[in-house]
């Protein structure tokens, strides 16, 4: 970061000559100099090049107007105003809070001024670097000799082996030097929350609006377990979203608690809806508790916010309404909601404390922000037992945490501070909105069919669009007012074949075909449903990637309309079974899968499968204890009715458990099995379209098998 922008020249000797001298002195200090054409050019440069570290300008020509414009982009950026003896200094106390320094035009002063600008630049970099990351950078630069872990010793060991050299060259020296031991006392301790690690947690809490934050280096799967192990003691009852991540299902297996399920909705497209308001009422919870063996009034509740498909709750209403002392929002997919006004009141940490309640929010920092994989955060607001919570934290945290992951979490937080952070999130929102409008435009201009987007008919402005009652676009029956909202950065593309109400057309294009087409062209889809594809517009998505996706969609339409051979359009799929696909064309494949889906009435089957819950014979914990004692056997998936499942069974997508350990399918819930068998049949008919079902294993004979508990006697 060594770029300084100079506004000029000015066409007068007494101004231009000192600036020329200064340019030479700054180059000698290691700076790179650029000369924007005008203020518009400068602002565009600052907006698109965060490596700039200073701006030099003439005060008489630009004054506070330019400073204010720059501050809207980055209020921390050093600004250097040059004045003469006649300049008017109309600067208020508020203005002096800017990173603004004044220098007089004078010959022979360039070297001293350049040294000062180097100092101010160093202060700027120090100011924007968060505490733990700063300490880690300093430690790496010191190049100390260590006789502790890790064994690669800052990468030295890798360079003693040919293959190790390949590894070292790929990842780079600093990455390996930053992988240090907990024995380095000046970096503090993640487990004891001391030193720079403590400073990092305090810094992150301030940034995200929490009272306390914890850094977790092995994913939100672990963060969820930490919160659950603390908040739901053995023998207690846990109120939990059935639309939960499998890590929470694992928590139920680990912890001897009784789950009481909050049942969410879903529409005919298979898009996950939220939990209706009625489910949060005291009357509804009392009914659930009364109907569940061993259940008591719940001590803790877990809600997935947002859903996988991007639906956010009115969390303020839930926090005030849900009569449970401890509420956990699993917000793995939305770590950015604190940083844009459209998300106000839709996150766990929004608003003030709620009397008598503690609010937890877990976030996968790596999913949508700029952090390394497995980077996660736990945010807390409210009274809690810090010592007991830290025991749960240490129970699930390695004693050799990855310091690069810690630094990446902290840096992700630092990137969101101030105007630069607001701009990052706003750019993602605006880019997603622009993409949505482009798809709409292409659909209107297209000859014949084109893709659609799951959204309200009009999306003129960036907002979280309400899933309002009576509206057709979302496809949810009996939607509640002011309850669920669609996140604009979660973009769901719809393919022809079925509308939001589940009405199927004569012809259709299953989304799996589009996903395979895009994948073979280097575009990876986040989630694929029967007739929809989910794309995430994170802060790392730029215009190039967005246009690449748009181009991929238009290329698919062109290839589909030409009815190309599978061999030419989807060569990787063709390679799965050349004999099967030898003479097949894309429209034949699309209509074949579409007819299979129509035959099984997928929309109705899917709705019924998720609407009727299986019978809980025992808790997931009790079922797990039976399994580790070996009291299990393997049966064909089609024989599952009447047997108690040993594992959770969930098809991906969407990755939501259909069957939990300890649950049994009955005649009333048999549609769960019918739905699973229907998913299996697609892969049996069309090679390359096998469904990934967690908890079910496909053997060489093509039969899916599952583990169930042995029957008594």
Task: For every predicted segment, state its role.
Residues 10-12, 60-61, 82-89, 108-109, ...:
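Short beta-alpha junction loops
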Residues 13-30, 39-57, 70, 76-77, ...:
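Non-catalytic terminal extensions of PLP-dependent enzymes
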Residues 163-254, 260:
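Long, structured ligand/cofactor-binding scaffold of large enzymes
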């Amino acid at each position: 970061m060594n770029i300084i922008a100079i506004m000029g020249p000015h066409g007068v000797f007494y101004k231009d000559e000192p600036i020329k001298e200064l340019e030479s002195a700054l180059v000698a200090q290691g700076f790179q100099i650029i000369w924007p054409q005008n203020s518009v050019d400068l602002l565009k440069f600052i907006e698109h090049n965060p490596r700039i570290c200073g701006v030099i300008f003439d005060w008489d020509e630009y004054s506070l107007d330019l400073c204010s414009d720059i501050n809207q982009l980055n209020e921390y950026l050093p600004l250097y105003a040059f004045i003469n003896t006649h300049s008017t200094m109309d600067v208020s106390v508020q203005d002096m809070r800017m990173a603004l320094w004044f220098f007089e035009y004078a010959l022979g002063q360039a070297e001293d001024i350049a040294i000062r600008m180097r100092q101010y630049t160093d202060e700027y970099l120090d100011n924007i670097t968060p505490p733990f990351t700063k300490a880690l950078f300093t430690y790496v630069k010191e190049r100390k000799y260590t006789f502790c872990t890790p064994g690669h010793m800052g990468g030295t060991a890798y360079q003693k082996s040919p293959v190790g050299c390949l590894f070292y060259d790929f990842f780079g020296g600093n990455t390996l030097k930053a992988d240090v031991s907990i024995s380095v006392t000046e970096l503090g301790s993640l487990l004891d929350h001391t030193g720079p690690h403590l400073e990092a947690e305090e810094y992150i809490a301030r940034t995200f609006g929490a009272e306390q934050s914890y850094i977790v280096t092995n994913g939100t799967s672990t963060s969820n377990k930490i919160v659950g192990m603390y908040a739901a003691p053995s023998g207690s009852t846990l109120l939990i979203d059935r639309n939960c991540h499998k890590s929470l299902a694992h928590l139920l297996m680990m912890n001897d608690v009784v789950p009481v399920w909050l049942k969410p909705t879903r529409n005919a497209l298979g898009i996950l809806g939220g939990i209706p308001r009625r489910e949060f009422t005291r009357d509804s919870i009392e009914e659930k508790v009364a109907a569940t063996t061993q259940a008591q009034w719940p001590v803790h509740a877990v809600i997935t916010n947002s859903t996988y498909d991007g639906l956010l709750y009115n969390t303020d209403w839930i926090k005030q309404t849900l009569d449970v002392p401890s509420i956990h929002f699993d917000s793995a997919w939305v770590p950015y909601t604190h940083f844009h006004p459209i998300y106000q009141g839709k996150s766990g940490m929004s608003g003030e404390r709620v009397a008598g309640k503690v609010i937890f929010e877990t976030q996968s920092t790596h999913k949508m922000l700029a952090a390394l994989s497995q980077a996660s955060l736990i945010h807390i607001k409210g009274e809690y037992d810090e010592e007991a919570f830290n025991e749960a934290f240490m129970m699930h945290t390695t004693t050799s945490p990855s310091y690069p992951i810690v630094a990446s979490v902290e840096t992700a937080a630092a990137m969101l501070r101030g105007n630069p952070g607001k701009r990052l999130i706003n750019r993602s929102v605006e880019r997603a909105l622009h993409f949505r409008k482009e798809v709409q435009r292409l659909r209107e201009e297209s000859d014949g069919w084109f893709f659609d987007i799951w959204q309200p008919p009009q999306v003129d402005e960036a907002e979280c669009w309400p899933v309002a009652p009576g509206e057709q676009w979302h496809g949810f029956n009996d939607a509640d007012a002011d309850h669920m909202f669609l996140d604009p950065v979660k973009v769901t593309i719809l393919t022809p074949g079925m509308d939001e109400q589940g009405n199927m057309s004569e012809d259709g294009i299953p989304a799996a075909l589009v996903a395979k087409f895009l994948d073979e062209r280097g575009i990876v889809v986040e989630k694929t449903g029967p007739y929809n594809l989910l794309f995430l517009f994170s802060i790392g998505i730029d215009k190039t990637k967005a246009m690449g996706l748009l181009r991929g969609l238009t290329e698919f339409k062109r290839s589909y309309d030409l009815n190309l051979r599978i061999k030419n359009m989807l060569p990787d799929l063709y390679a799965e079974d050349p004999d099967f696909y030898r003479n097949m064309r894309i429209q034949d494949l699309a209509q074949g899968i579409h007819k299979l889906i129509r035959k099984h009435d997928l929309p109705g089957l899917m709705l019924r499968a998720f609407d009727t819950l299986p019978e809980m014979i025992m808790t997931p914990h009790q079922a797990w204890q039976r399994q580790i004692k070996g009291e299990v056997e393997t049966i064909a998936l089609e024989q599952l009715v009447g047997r108690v499942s040993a594992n959770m069974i969930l098809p991906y997508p969407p990755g939501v458990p259909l069957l939990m350990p300890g649950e049994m399918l009955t005649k009333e819930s048999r549609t769960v099995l019918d739905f699973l068998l229907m998913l299996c049949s697609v892969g049996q008919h069309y090679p390359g379209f096998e469904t990934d079902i967690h908890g079910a294993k496909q053997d060489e004979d093509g039969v899916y098998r599952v583990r169930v508990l042995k029957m008594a006697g």
